């Protein structure tokens, strides 16, 4: 569980417009299964009314480019996948994340690997890292599951990694699958600064 408190406010000039961002530091109530969890911060955009909002893709890219005090900045979006295993299809809580996410969390795979930068490109993003529980229940805890294909939203994804049993992210959701978050340059909606759907960690 996180208690979010304001750490500091960062003013960043983007073109002719000055954007004000509130940087939130995660304070640990219960020890989280990450290395140096006290160094993980959640970044929000603050609207004129002072309310925290998620972040648009162009804003995330600005922050990532301009970041000076953070070693890495990652974006993620929570989703539900439709998983077609051996039984009836079921919803699987998931996350689409930039490859930097596991770097920010200093998290390594229990089996296989996490994402590589090349998998943030549309067309190269059909890989998945699964939770230890998913691997046990759905894939028989078989090490040979690495390299196998599973169906998420009727699309084949190659299993490249299994996370450790204690790994949770986000901690408020029982996430079972992580896939790369690739930004399509042809997606005009995604290129809008008004389309705020990302959570940023650094």
Question: Where are each of the predicted segments found?
Answer:
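Membrane-interface helix starts
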Residues: 1-8, 12, 16
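Loop/turn elements at helix/coil->beta-strand transitions in domains of secreted/extracellular proteins
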Residues: 38-39, 70-72, 155-158
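Structural beta->alpha junctions
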Residues: 46-51, 86-88, 164-166, 202
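Mid-to-C-terminal secondary-structure elements
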Residues: 80, 93-117, 126-202
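Residues that recognize and position ribonucleotide moieties
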Residues: 21, 53, 90, 95, ...
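Membrane-helix entry/capping segments
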Residues: 1-5, 33-35, 46-50, 88-91, ...
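Short amphipathic beta-strand/extended segments in non-transmembrane regions
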Residues: 42-45, 58-116
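Alpha-helical transmembrane segments
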Residues: 12-39
